[in-house]
């Protein structure tokens, strides 16, 4: 059927058999229509033309809520998308909802929950909500649009009571791996309730801002759970063209979900379960979403920082980080620390460490291997580690007879070694290179005795690794004595598995007893590394070393597309091994990339980005593409949050000290300069690992390593409350702070209640 022809017939009054007159308080519109069209398009007209007295009439007058909107609805029956109005979006929704309801037609009520109404239209919004009824979502709309100067005494006593109760409800939500702990009336008591328990392999990633939905991930599938409804957003079959999931992120207001695949980014609006953007991207190392989910920032393989509008996909700004003079040591490793926990090393001998230096000065790889035997029977031997003469005596160091003299009972802490003594790096033609970047790998070799070393600190020279990101042809994996090799052998008694932490760019290396169920290294790391898992026999076969050294066998050099190096330190609470750095290649471009878990991005506002690299904070002007300010901290920054109001940032360093920076901006929102307002020395009180702002920027919520939740009042500079979680064995994934808490509004609600109670005592 050609609807355009039907529309022309109706406009020219050809073959029409009924006249409909639409009337409202101020408009009257006459339409000449075809009965069969309106009968088949709407249940209202079906009943009107068959069951009522109007069925015999050729002219019908309808008193409708809005004649202009109904006119557009009827022409939609003819396949025409007509807008005969100039209403703002919020008013069009309200008026069209009334008209659809008049005709008994369904409409999407969820759009109501996102309405933004102008102050002069708030009374009209209240009349509409009064018409459809009050529920939690409707009251949320009232909160979101309530003018600052509105007289709350206009509300009923019941509505004010419900608003006050709802405003304090669900103030803080603690997200663990399989449950949501809701802290009701956080300021007044310590009421705990548990909701959305999940007894399945799925892990809760975060909870939407209105607490009605949760997003889960089971390693392959991402779902949105709402009541008894489960909506699948991504699985292996639906995104086969996008590759595997590399990273999952979300906006700070918890309403927008960002899924990074190997070749694509998908952006979902969690509140309406809708895919709002999808675009292909190059290899991405890091990404972050703005507070409201409108902008995305990511860094590609060439260290270009790209800021993009999510809905329009317009690139707002593109900045090459390496071209900014202030970021000269973007890929520095000033200090690498290996900490081991004696309880975790009960099966791993560790009185012999192997230190390997590797460099990529040209198309070949040269290995310089130095072994350091730590005879823990004699503490004086530790001082001899700094003697460079010992490095050349490899025969003595590798003498297995010397190892039998060690004493199992000795326990020494904080073993230190300075790597500056190991600077001899040669290419295949024995030419010594200047300023060649190096990276270090520490491995534990098998031996007969176990000694307990709690930490090994390696102080490396500060070197820029950006120059070392050059193509390579092969990597002699027979020289890599890494526990990761055990992944190819599922029968090993002590296996290691690498798994991604979806809440941060840090990967975890944890020791498991028994089999790893044949899980591939490529699957575990979520990177393209099929050659390692599929050709593990070839990689670990020392007989193939001759082939690797033979340049004529270049066809076989694809066995090692990735160089993976690990420096691990333990989380003594959760007994996890933290993967500090990994270096791998992009298969297409064969370029090295250094992933740094201490590299973070966040939006301060739409004009300014926060970029953190290890100990340094960079404030970047998005528009002018320049560094506004550079702040160097004493320690690496492990977590940070920007205030939703854009007036401060909070960071947690590696010593669990929280710093709060006050941000000074001009009238247009451009950052002038940041100042350290104060720091919270909380190490002796608790160990904060997660941090979250309230929506008004006044309060900070800290996670005390899964033991308790602490609330800090920024204005009063004091802890205001502490909530014991009693969940020592649970890992907190996320903290959600109520979107709307504001002391001033609470006072306004209470005052309005008192005024009504005084006016109507009974």
UniProtKB/Swiss-Prot annotation:
Keyword terms, alphabetized: Coiled coil
Coiled-coil features, chain-numbered ranges: 737-762
Record flagged with keyword Mitochondrion: no
Biased segments, Acidic residues type: 390-410
Domain BTB: 16-86
Similarity comment text for this entry: Belongs to the mimivirus BTB/WD family.
Entry-linked Pfam families: BTB
Gene3D superfamilies: Potassium Channel Kv1.1, Chain A
Protein name: Putative BTB/POZ domain-containing protein L272
Organism: Acanthamoeba polyphaga mimivirus (APMV)
Higher taxonomy: Viruses, Varidnaviria, Bamfordvirae, Nucleocytoviricota, Megaviricetes
Stretch list, region Disordered: 390-411, 532-556
Residue stretches of biased makeup (Low complexity): 532-543
């Amino acid at each position: 059927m050609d609807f355009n022809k039907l529309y022309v017939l109706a406009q020219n009054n050809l073959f029409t058999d009924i006249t409909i007159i639409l009337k409202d308080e101020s408009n009257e519109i006459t339409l000449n229509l075809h009965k069969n069209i309106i009968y088949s398009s709407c249940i209202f007209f079906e009943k009107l033309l068959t069951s009522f007295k109007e069925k015999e009439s050729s002219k019908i007058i309808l008193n409708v809520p809005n004649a202009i909107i109904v006119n557009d609805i009827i022409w939609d029956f003819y396949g025409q998308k007509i807008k005969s109005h100039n209403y703002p979006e919020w008013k069009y929704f309200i008026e069209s909802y009334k008209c659809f309801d008049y005709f008994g037609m369904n409409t999407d009520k969820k759009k109501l929950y996102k309405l933004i109404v102008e102050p002069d239209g708030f009374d009209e919004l209240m009349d509409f909500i009064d018409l459809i009824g009050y529920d939690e979502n409707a009251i949320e709309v009232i909160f979101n649009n309530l003018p600052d100067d509105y007289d709350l005494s206009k509300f009923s006593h019941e509505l004010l009571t419900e608003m006050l109760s709802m405003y304090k409800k669900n103030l803080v939500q603690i997200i663990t791996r399989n449950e949501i702990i809701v802290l009701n009336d956080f300021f007044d008591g310590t009421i705990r309730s548990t909701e959305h328990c999940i007894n399945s392999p799925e892990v809760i990633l975060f909870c939407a801002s209105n607490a009605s939905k949760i997003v889960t991930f089971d390693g392959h599938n991402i779902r949105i759970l709402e009541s008894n409804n489960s909506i699948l957003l991504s699985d292996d079959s639906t995104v086969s063209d996008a590759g595997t999931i590399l990273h999952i992120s979300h906006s700070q207001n918890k309403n927008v979900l960002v899924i990074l695949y190997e070749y694509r980014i998908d952006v979902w609006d969690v509140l309406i379960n809708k895919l709002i953007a999808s675009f292909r991207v190059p290899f991405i190392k890091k990404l972050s979403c703005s507070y409201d989910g409108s902008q995305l920032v990511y860094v590609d393989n060439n260290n270009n920082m790209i800021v993009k509008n999510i809905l329009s996909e317009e690139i707002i700004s593109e900045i090459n980080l390496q071209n900014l003079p202030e970021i000269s040591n973007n890929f520095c490793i000033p200090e690498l620390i290996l900490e081991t926990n004696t309880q975790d090393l009960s099966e791993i001998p560790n009185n012999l460490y192997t230190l390997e230096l590797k460099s990529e000065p040209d198309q070949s790889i040269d290995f310089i291997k130095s072994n350091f035997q730590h005879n823990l029977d004699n503490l004086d031997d530790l001082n001899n580690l700094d003697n460079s003469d010992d490095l050349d005596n490899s025969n003595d160091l590798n003498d297995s007879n010397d190892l039998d003299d060690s004493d199992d009972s000795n326990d020494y802490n904080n073993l230190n070694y300075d790597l500056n003594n190991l600077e001899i790096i040669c290419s295949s033609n024995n030419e010594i290179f200047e300023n060649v970047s190096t990276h270090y790998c520490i491995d534990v070799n098998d031996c007969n005795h176990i000694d307990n070393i709690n930490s090994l600190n390696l102080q490396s020279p500060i070197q820029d690794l950006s120059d070392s990101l050059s193509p390579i042809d092969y990597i002699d994996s027979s020289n890599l004595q890494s526990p990761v090799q055990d992944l190819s052998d599922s029968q090993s008694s002590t296996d290691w598995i690498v798994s991604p932490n979806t809440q941060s760019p840090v990967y975890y290396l944890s020791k498991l007893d028994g089999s790893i169920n044949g899980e591939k290294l490529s699957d575990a790391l979520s990177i393209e590394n099929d050659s390692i898992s599929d050709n593990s026999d070839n990689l670990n076969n020392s007989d193939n070393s001759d082939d690797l050294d033979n340049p004529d066998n270049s066809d076989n050099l694809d066995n090692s597309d990735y160089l993976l190096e690990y420096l691990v330190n333990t989380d003594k609470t959760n007994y996890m091994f933290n993967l500090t750095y990994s270096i791998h290649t992009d298969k297409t471009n064969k370029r090295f990339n250094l992933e740094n878990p201490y590299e973070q991005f966040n939006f301060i506002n739409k004009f300014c980005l926060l970029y953190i690299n290890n100990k340094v904070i960079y404030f970047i002007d998005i528009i002018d593409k320049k560094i506004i300010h550079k702040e160097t901290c004493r320690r690496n920054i492990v977590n940070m949050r920007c205030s939703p109001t854009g007036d401060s940032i909070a960071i947690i360093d590696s010593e669990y000290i929280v710093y709060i920076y006050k941000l000074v901006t001009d009238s247009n929102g451009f950052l002038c300069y940041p100042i350290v307002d104060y720091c919270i020395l909380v190490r002796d009180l608790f160990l904060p690992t997660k941090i979250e702002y309230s929506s008004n920027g006044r309060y900070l919520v800290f996670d005390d390593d899964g033991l308790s939740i602490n609330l800090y009042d920024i204005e009063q500079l004091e802890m205001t409350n502490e909530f014991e979680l009693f969940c020592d064995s649970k890992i907190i994934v996320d903290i959600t702070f109520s979107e709307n808490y504001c002391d001033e509004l609470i006072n306004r609600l209470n005052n309005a209640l008192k005024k009504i109670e005084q006016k109507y005592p009974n």
